[in-house]
């Protein structure tokens, strides 16, 4: 909105200094600062309101240390989503299809998460929204993103082709499997972030690091010179994704002001599903979805721990008549909680791992 306003004024009067609005780095920085300030200023009043209505009960099977979170308001993801949407509307070329596809993903999965949180907190329905309806919501989003990027001419440059990390000339063409793969990636990543949201600051901090990395890739992919030099797909208009990415990063950082241990608020499924879908769609749009197991490695490990736990339990129960577990509790962060690690230590160590995964993903730009 500000972008179009200043551009209109500049076209009329050609005022000195207004050309800066055309620079991606300026608008990405402005979007980041705006998202941070909105979160910090709106946060206190928003938390006060949520405390009167939306207190999420802690699960009975949660670790003992988790029981003290029984009075925390949930649906904090609404604050993240609001900050992102406003800053992106102000500073991005929001009519760009890359931008509104990401915004659509955040809003849609935010609504799915809100319904889930509302059913748990207000209607007192144990488990919230059933897994079936969550899956329907995720598949619907995947169909929209997949079909739009498949059929819209503005995405026809690469269409169903993607690159393989660490290989200079190796590409994969999904062909008619493209749309099912888009559905799978959006579903998997949104669920992975949702599983990770179990400790104060863990999901928000990890998401900020991952999106910062993807934002860097977006900036490079949107510049023809950098893309050719680094041998990554050139995405016309893809640089706008960097503006959105920085808004997401700083909205998460602002949320950490209130969500760091001891948390005043938790994001709930409203935030975790929205952030997960944003990560997935950004990666898909810049053709770096095969990099997700590395750059979003912490989410991958959390999901893997749950999958292994369930599969091993079912196998041992079928084989020996009694189910056994690999971990004390899944997801992985709860395993370390039950081993006696302090919550802050787990979160910071997981952040460190996420930074290492981020740096390793940057190395793929040259290790080809």
Curated annotation (Swiss-Prot):
One of the protein's GO biological processes: regulation of cell shape
Required cofactor(s): Mg(2+)
Disulfide feature: none
Domain of life, per lineage: Bacteria
Reactions accelerated catalytically: UDP-N-acetyl-alpha-D-muramoyl-L-alanyl-gamma-D-glutamyl-meso-2,6-diaminopimeloyl-D-alanyl-D-alanine + di-trans,octa-cis-undecaprenyl phosphate = di-trans,octa-cis-undecaprenyl diphospho-N-acetyl-alpha-D-muramoyl-L-alanyl-D-glutamyl-meso-2,6-diaminopimeloyl-D-alanyl-D-alanine + UMP
Membrane-spanning residues: 30-50, 72-92, 95-115, 139-159, 169-189, 208-228, 238-258, 264-286, 345-365
GO cellular component: plasma membrane
EC number(s) recorded for this UniProt protein: 2.7.8.13
Pfam families named among the record's database cross-references: Glycos_transf_4
Descriptive protein name: Phospho-N-acetylmuramoyl-pentapeptide-transferase
